Amino acid sequence: MAEQVALSRTQVCGILREELYQGDAFHQADTHIFIIMGASGDLAKKKIYPTIWWLFRDGLLPEDTFIVGYARSRLTVDDIRKQSEPFFKVTPEERPKLEEFFARNSYVAGQYDDPASYKHLNSHMNALHQGMQANRLFYLALPPTVYEAVTKNIQEICMSQTGWNRIIVEKPFGRDLQSSNQLSNHISSLFREDQIYRIDHYLGKEMVQNLMVLRFANRIFGPIWNRDNIACVILTFKEPFGTEGRGGYFDEFGIIRDVMQNHLLQMLCLVAMEKPASTDSDDVRDEKVKVLKCISEVETDNVVLGQYVGNPSGEGEATNGYLDDPTVPHGSTTATFAAAVLYVENERWDGVPFILRCGKALNERKAEVRLQFRDVAGDIFHQQCKRNELVIRVQPNEAVYTKMMTKKPGMFFNPEESELDLTYGNRYKNVKLPDAYERLILDVFCGSQMHFVRSDELREAWRIFTPLLHKIDREKPQPIPYVYGSRGPTEADELMKRVGFQYEGTYKWVNPHKL
């Protein structure tokens, strides 16, 4: 077999550009204005400006694209550049291109609830080359408290009259079903659904997008992807650090609202959904909604909540617990860890537990989907066989691998755990996977909503978790303490075992490329 030749970034971007230009959705010849509402904030500085730069650098934006920052702070483009450029990862050869990029940037200061400020913003955009006819993309990098005023003023004052208009909305999309519906109803009264892009950056990650391809482009998985063969599904999100001085914001929402109700539930949908009629955005999202409608409200008996405490033998931040963060309210009962079991009550998945786990200050950084298969019927190996597992590792080190039994090498005739492994870093050497925001913002330029959350998806997701969240808010149960750097509360392991997950603890992954 001939060795695969790695493509350079220039070649990869060239192929993608060619595909974009040949398609009908990417309006290469049109003028576009990308407006960052909240341009002075952390999200804009660390994610949005760097992402727009990477797309511009790689020639993946329409040529006549302008970037306009808008915020209350009185800043200049130079100020924005000083704040954001450290996150750009610019090489010396890219410096001339960087100057071109910032030449296409401008900044307007104004209030979020003042129509006169938006008239000034609109006049500024109209004055750009072809500005009155330009397609306009508004990225709302703002707290939800100002969404209503901002969207109303955009719709009434700042819309392009001849080009298309799209808005990108960041989570959190409300705090519960009622507030989410209120926000959705307001935005839907101003914009059509095909103009609204509710962004969940996890839907832009390589392996999350790979779930559909793995499932529906491979014959081998179809016959076994059901309750007859799969014992349980575990969806995991782990961070090795705590709030580290940012606990005030986190405390408003907690880990369920921050991670479980959106990131993990979206991954669950991609695992559990039926094959869509096509890869059209609404065909895919229709199937995700069907899954969510089959999930009952989460039961408190199937939930474990935890909060990290300092590790006396740790170092640095690890010695601090959540309540030691000076920005966290005294005596807060907000959970920094949660495990919950959901059931998809349909013919394919009836009785199969979907275990969602997420937490801060844990023993590693990891996000993955793990399908554990049922025991082999008619055991002839004297209970030496462990369950097969299919693992899709989202981060770090993207990979797909299968835990399976093979004969132990040599004179033995005993089964041994091994794996079939596709680690992206080994198979696709020198291929730089794009950041999730790069994929998603490019999707907005192309008008593709497949990887964005539709209003009915959002409504069903909140329906599942709102009763639990209201009960937690009302009763403020004391979360179980767990040590910074541990696997989380042992009660979570007990919950997983109770619903059918088998943790063997005998398997050790060996990187075959380092033998």
Swiss-Prot record:
Residues engaged in binding NADP(+) 1: 38-45, 72, 147, 171
The organism's place on the tree of life at top rank: Eukaryota
Primary location class: cytoplasm
PTM annotation (N6-(2-hydroxyisobutyryl)lysine): residues: 171
Enzyme class: oxidoreductase
Post-translational modification: Acetylated by ELP3 at Lys-403; acetylation inhibits its homodimerization and enzyme activity. Deacetylated by SIRT2 at Lys-403; deacetylation stimulates its enzyme activity.
Binding site for NADP(+) 2: 357, 366, 370, 393, 401-403, 421-423, 487, 503, 509
Modified-residue entries (N6-acetyllysine), positions: 89, 171, 403, 432, 497
Keyword Phosphoprotein on entry: yes
Annotated InterPro entries: G6P_DH, G6P_DH_AS, G6P_DH_C, G6P_DH_NAD-bd, NAD(P)-bd_dom_sf
UniProt membrane topology term: Peripheral membrane protein
Keyword set, alphabetical order: Acetylation, Carbohydrate metabolism, Cytoplasm, Glucose metabolism, Hydroxylation, Membrane, NADP, Oxidoreductase, Phosphoprotein
Similarity-based family: Belongs to the glucose-6-phosphate dehydrogenase family.
Function per UniProt: Cytosolic glucose-6-phosphate dehydrogenase that catalyzes the first and rate-limiting step of the oxidative branch within the pentose phosphate pathway/shunt, an alternative route to glycolysis for the dissimilation of carbohydrates and a major source of reducing power and metabolic intermediates for fatty acid and nucleic acid biosynthetic processes.
UniProt name for this protein: Glucose-6-phosphate 1-dehydrogenase
